[in-house]
Amino acid sequence: MSGIAVSDDCVQKFNELKLGHQHRYVTFKMNASNTEVVVEHVGGPNATYEDFKSQLPERDCRYAIFDYEFQVDGGQRNKITFILWAPDSAPIKSKMMYTSTKDSIKKKLVGIQVEVQATDAAEISEDAVSERAKKDVK
């Protein structure tokens, strides 16, 4: 949907995660009037993947960025992962709005390395996200 803005705070928190590793994750939502994407939660640098998942509502959509760390060939890697959480139980209008605004927020958050679209808990499990993050690592 055109006309939905992305707040400057969203870009700032993303850059703090990407450049300064000040946050482990950031979740974003539509504001009350559905005119702007705003920051909802910020997880500190020691937050876990479970902490992050606990911030996602069961019956509504969200965008999120997670600084995913994993081991490959004895070395640690990070992948900045964009997640569109659109659970099956979310209202149709919400799913349509989040899906159609996804490209707008991704254009503002420069440096996303992995994208995950999840409609249920299995698609957002740590194993599923880990598999996606490791997919392009040589």
Curated annotation (Swiss-Prot):
Pfam families: Cofilin_ADF. Keywords: Actin-binding, Cytoplasm. GO terms for cellular component: actin cytoskeleton; cytoplasm. PROSITE patterns: ADF_H. GO terms for biological process: actin filament depolymerization. It is found in: Cytoplasm. One of its GO terms (molecular function) is actin binding. Monomer. This is Actophorin. It comes from Acanthamoeba castellanii (Amoeba).
